[in-house]
């Protein structure tokens, strides 16, 4: 345990003061708003961009300068008039600004880390891409046997998130402001029935940052244990850090297994218990080449360690151990499974020829069409059966504006899901968006889709719904013939840093 504490102390060696004065600077809110301005038609709070203005920010900063408004009385909720009648808008503005501020220490830490290793800042756009995980899965998961499917729970109390951030930020005023937000809205964050409304939708970036910082705290310990496991591969979880017994256990294992015929088949558990861990938000996956007993030991150890040292309460039904051969797991809007790719090799020796059937394991990644149809139905692009419908829009939006919004959604979706091995599902989603756009325009002009397309022509829709193939041809015109075969295969773009809105059909944090 002392080694773990020293490890964490090194990670927390950089702390930053005086972040609280930045809350009173107008440019902070401008940066925060510009960074999150690219909201699509699927935005949970479309009115926020229309109501945002520098005048409102100045008025909010003036109210924050009056310290008596920050006094919170637990007995009389009406006494605190800090947010006033515009509490939802003010709350979101403060939340986005505060989220931008508290990310500064982590950004500085990343820059200093890169400078320390290479004496210069490295362009790490590809390393930030969340889709870079799928080439990793294709390269490493094909030879694994078991997968541990984990749904990480919320912390039991908001103060845990504040204490986690306190390791990095020593500014007490900023931490008090964070307590102000969490204490008033904690129930709406952890209650499933309330998690889809109110505070969470308006302040999602802030809470995701706090949650990820807390998860990274115990994931750093997990990385430490994984590094130490290279010396302790056969040690049970109860004495996982006691190196003194390691070699003795190895000798006893050899004495036991040497009497078994399949000694080499069993000894690999001691030599190479390959483990891979990936996570996005609350979804985590731990894959291994070991046996069910080996994975159960990891499960018991991690649950016990996280509950005792990080106050995370895991329910047994949140963690599943499945065989990769007959189980598909969902991650980042994709569904991945391990399938056998048959191949036939013809071998000829003199006058005799033989056909040798080989089966190669391959990770197959595709789009789960049914959850996406449900997500499109909730966003009013289609009904539950997948039939496109017109989407209600504001009357002051022009036709080109509506087309641009639908086109942006379609192109982003194609860009995000270009790695799918089943293109049929991708084409179906494009068809729904294309026809929904046509019906939306026809509804605006109070006519039918057929009449609208005859009057304006189908080119109106085709010019903004460029397929990935067209984009590749426009980017590489000289290699258009060779790119035809490339487009039929999967393409992973390494410039995507957030999950697609439509792909995130699961309940968010």
UniProtKB/Swiss-Prot annotation:
Domain of life per record: Eukaryota
GO BP, sorted A to Z: mRNA processing; RNA splicing; tRNA processing
Keyword RNA-binding recorded: yes
Signal as UniProt keyword: no
Subcellular location: Plastid
GO cellular component labels: chloroplast
Keyword line: mRNA processing, Plastid, RNA-binding, tRNA processing
GO molecular function, one term: RNA binding
Family listed: Belongs to the intron maturase 2 family. MatK subfamily.
Protein purpose: Usually encoded in the trnK tRNA gene intron. Probably assists in splicing its own and other chloroplast group II introns.
Matches recorded under HAMAP family: MatK
Protein name per its UniProtKB record: Maturase K
Species annotation: Castilleja linariifolia (Wyoming Indian paintbrush)
Gene coding for it: matK
């Amino acid at each position: 345990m002392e080694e773990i504490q020293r490890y964490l102390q090194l990670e927390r060696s950089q702390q930053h003061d005086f972040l609280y004065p930045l809350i009173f600077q107008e440019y902070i809110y401008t940066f925060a708003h510009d960074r999150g301005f690219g909201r699509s038609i699927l935005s949970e709070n479309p009115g926020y961009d229309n109501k945002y203005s520098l005048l409102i920010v100045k008025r909010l900063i003036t109210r924050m300068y009056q310290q008596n408004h920050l006094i919170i009385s637990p007995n009389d909720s009406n006494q605190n008039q800090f947010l006033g009648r515009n509490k939802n808008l003010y709350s979101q503005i403060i939340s986005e600004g505060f989220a931008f501020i508290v990310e500064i220490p982590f950004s500085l830490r990343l820059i200093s880390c890169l400078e320390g290793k290479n004496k210069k800042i490295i362009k790490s756009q590809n390393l930030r891409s969340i889709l870079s995980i799928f080439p990793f899965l294709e390269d490493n998961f094909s030879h694994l046997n078991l997968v541990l499917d984990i749904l990480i729970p919320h912390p039991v109390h908001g103060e845990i998130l504040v204490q986690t951030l306190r390791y990095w930020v020593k500014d007490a005023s900023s931490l008090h402001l964070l307590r102000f937000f969490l204490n008033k809205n904690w129930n709406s964050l952890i209650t499933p029935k309330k998690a889809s409304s109110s505070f969470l939708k308006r302040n999602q970036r802030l809470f995701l940052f706090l949650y990820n910082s807390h998860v990274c705290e115990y994931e750093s310990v997990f990385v430490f244990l994984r590094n130490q496991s290279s010396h302790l591969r056969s040690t049970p979880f109860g004495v996982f850090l006691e190196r003194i017994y390691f070699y003795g256990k190895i000798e006893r294992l050899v004495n036991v297994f040497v009497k078994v015929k399949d000694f080499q088949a069993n000894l690999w558990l001691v030599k190479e218990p390959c483990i891979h861990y990936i996570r996005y938000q609350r979804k985590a996956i731990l894959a291994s080449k070991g046996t069910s007993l080996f994975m159960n030991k990891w499960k018991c150890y991690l649950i016990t360690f996280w509950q005792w040292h990080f106050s995370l309460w895991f329910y047994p039904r949140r963690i599943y151990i499945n065989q990769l051969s007959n189980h598909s797991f969902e991650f980042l809007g994709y569904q991945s499974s391990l399938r056998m790719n048959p191949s036939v090799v013809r071998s000829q020796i003199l006058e005799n020829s033989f056909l040798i059937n080989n089966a190669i394991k391959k990770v197959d990644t595709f789009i789960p069409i049914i959850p996406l149809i449900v997500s499109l139905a909730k966003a009013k692009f289609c009904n539950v059966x997948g039939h496109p419908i017109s989407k209600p829009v504001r009357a002051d939006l022009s036709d080109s504006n509506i087309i641009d919004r639908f086109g942006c959604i379609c192109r982003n979706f194609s860009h995000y899901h270009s790695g799918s091995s089943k293109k049929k599902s991708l084409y179906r989603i494009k068809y729904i968006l294309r026809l929904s756009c046509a019906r939306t325009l026809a509804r605006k002009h109070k006519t039918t889709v057929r009449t609208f397309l005859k009057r304006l022509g189908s080119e109106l829709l085709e010019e903004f719904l460029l397929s990935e193939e067209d984009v590749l041809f426009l980017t590489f015109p000289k290699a258009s013939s060779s790119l035809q075969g490339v487009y039929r295969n999967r393409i992973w773009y390494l410039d995507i840093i957030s999950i697609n809105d439509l792909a995130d059909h699961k309940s968010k944090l």
